[in-house]
Amino acid sequence: MVNPMVIGYIGSAAAIIGFGSNYVPVKKYPVGNGLSYAFILSIGGLCVAFIAMMIHGTFVFSPIGILGGSLWAMANLLIIPIIKLVGLGLGVLLWSSIGIVVGFFSGKFGWLGLEKQIVTHDWMNWLGFVGIVISIFCFFFIKPSLEDDNNNKNVVDRFKNKKGGYIDPMDNEEFPILRGSVNSDGPIKFNKYNNNNNNGDELETSTETIFDKIPTKFKKVAGISMSIICGVLLGVNMIPMQLWKQNHQEASPFDIIFSQFAGVFLFNAFTFMFYAMIKKSPQIYPKTVFPSFISGVMWGIANCGLMISTQNLGYTVGYPISCSGPMIISSLWSVFYFHEIKGTKNLLILCGSFLFLISGIILLAFSSF
């Protein structure tokens, strides 16, 4: 029989890789305001939950699990705006760190009905928390480079033909992964560009989004504010499941996993349907559907890994490892692939942030031993 500790670390590895990479498949595809992306992502996650439920052989459908999934879905709707405003690396660093802090206080003080967690070395517990707070403060000084996203606002001009009309850059082989999205204020038909007359005087849609309209000097403030809200929601989204487990001591996290994932799906489904009824021309990009589904599958596997890790390694070990590791992975993507974080100053700040963050996580993890 496999050692539970080994299973726990395998779960942590799945969570770290999955959470740190699950937004990469859609990073260079147009997602508009993110509503259709979130809906398709939830379908991918629900498929993973269904498979996990079948493997585990149990099924529990609890309203409290639906609540937890809905809290996560609310946070997820903020992900696309955050990535557009401050980049993938900095965004994940912020909301993940804040989520860890919120989770720390929730367990430390027994917020929202949770049982207070008593640790062996309280001083180490608090010192670890301070290390995380310092790392979050350091993240504010990182200035990601998002020139590629800003340049996409004018990309449509490169597709203007001699007759004044426009062709769809999504269909052009030169730009197979165009990041620009459609103006949410105008009607759209699968991101097609149409002119209202033969002279091409007016364009029905553009690649500009509401996020592109935010003045540059306010983008970072808006992105950081959304990251804080997102982090809080992520930090409390597992509390409903923990409350359920307090009343079912012998239960496995997999017993309620389908309810948690169903909450994510139902919230996104209702949100997207409401948006479609109000907007009447929702932003749907055919080429983004499959990457969104893959993103959802990766998230679903990562979330299952988090549950396995927490169950086998404990909340003070499995949870910090699984929630801090993705920040490193996402930053590596941001530095080496997307080139959002570059420059000696930014890289030094990033390394310093990691030093405090990793030290804090280690102290938190070992404070109960």
From Swiss-Prot:
Question: How is this protein annotated for GO cellular component?
Answer: membrane
Looking up InterPro entries in the UniProt record yields:
Sugar_transport, TMEM144
Q: Name one Pfam family in it.
A: TMEM144
Q: What is its subcellular localisation?
A: Membrane
This protein's record includes keyword Membrane: yes
Entry keyword set = Membrane, Transmembrane, Transmembrane helix
A GO molecular function annotation here is: carbohydrate transmembrane transporter activity
Q: Which domain of life is it from?
A: Eukaryota
Bilayer-crossing regions: 6-26, 35-55, 63-83, 85-105, 122-142, 221-241, 256-276, 288-308, 318-338, 347-367
Q: Topology relative to the membrane, per the entry?
A: Multi-pass membrane protein
Q: Is Cytoplasm among the key words of this record?
A: no
Which protein family is it in? Belongs to the TMEM144 family.
Recorded protein name is Transmembrane protein 144 homolog A
Q: Can you name the source organism?
A: Dictyostelium discoideum
The organism's taxonomy opens as: Eukaryota, Amoebozoa, Evosea, Eumycetozoa, Dictyostelia
